[in-house]
Amino acid sequence: MPFVEEEFEILKPTKALFLVRDVLKCSLKEAQRHLDKQRLKQNQQTVRKSQIIQGVVRLIYFKPNEKQEKLVFEAKDFGVFDKPAQIYTHPKGYFYHESLLDCIQSHFGKNAHPAHRLDYETSGLVLAGKTLQSTKDLKALFMQKKVKKTYLALAHGLVDKSIIINKPILTPQNIQKDLRIRSQISPLGKPSITLVEPLSYNPFLDISLLKITPLTGRTHQIRLHLSSVDHRIVGEGLYGVADENAREYLQLKRENNAPTLMLHAASLEFEFKGAHYKIASPMPERFMPFLKD
């Protein structure tokens, strides 16, 4: 795990903000971000940024692991990373789990950021700008729908022909608090379209391998759309299941014990500064046991 916890002994009274700055050799703004995320503790108590400290403290910080390479393509202004399943694209609250942002910034520096995101459960390609400006320009491509994204998924049941799923998606606000991340098919939702193409079928497991092209970018769109046509993705615990099962799945996710979702962002195709790019990621090893011999 690239987040490490290290102990330091402070011999004379020192402001917490300055300590973090000096230890991590970062700016005051970056040091403040670490303190806001409650990463400095003394006697198991969170240290505030204005606090004067002395004695033994413990600091949690990201230490890049050079052996854990995920960069699959690099250009002058951006890179493309292959995110594993069950890793966040961005840091999540006060948690110290690895995120893809950590990997991106270990390669390109602190001004590098993802231009879009993948769900925690989904693996595959993520485009990242090397600077704030390039990230802004790349985000504009996604907003203007100038990036073609394709996914691979393993889904329950036989899909023997192409499907266009055109169902509006609503992200509700006034629902059970513990299930608030779940989107819904609703006439009040935003237009959402997903193209589904069958690639193969394993009759022994009753599982189809699908190529999926989302034409819109709603939260959990592919997962919700496939569940809505009775082809739930293998490993899906949030959609197409009863509320109690969804709650159990979310608890397992918090404990890092949730089943792996069989959804992979397989390719990105776009034009940027006069050049055409098509970047592909191979099918994940976790898919192989489900495929027909």
Curated annotation (Swiss-Prot):
Provide the reaction this enzyme catalyses: a uridine in RNA = a pseudouridine in RNA
Family annotation (PROSITE patterns): PSI_RLU
**In its UniProt record, which GO terms are filed under biological process?**
enzyme-directed rRNA pseudouridine synthesis
Q: EC top class, in one word?
A: isomerase
In this protein, the active site sits at: D119
- Give one GO molecular function term: RNA binding
Q: Where are the annotated coiled coils located?
A: none
The domain of life is Bacteria
Question: Which protein family is it in?
Answer: Belongs to the pseudouridine synthase RluA family.
Which protein, by its recorded name, is this?
Answer: Uncharacterized RNA pseudouridine synthase jhp_0321
Phylogenetic classification of the source organism: Bacteria, Pseudomonadati, Campylobacterota, Epsilonproteobacteria, Campylobacterales
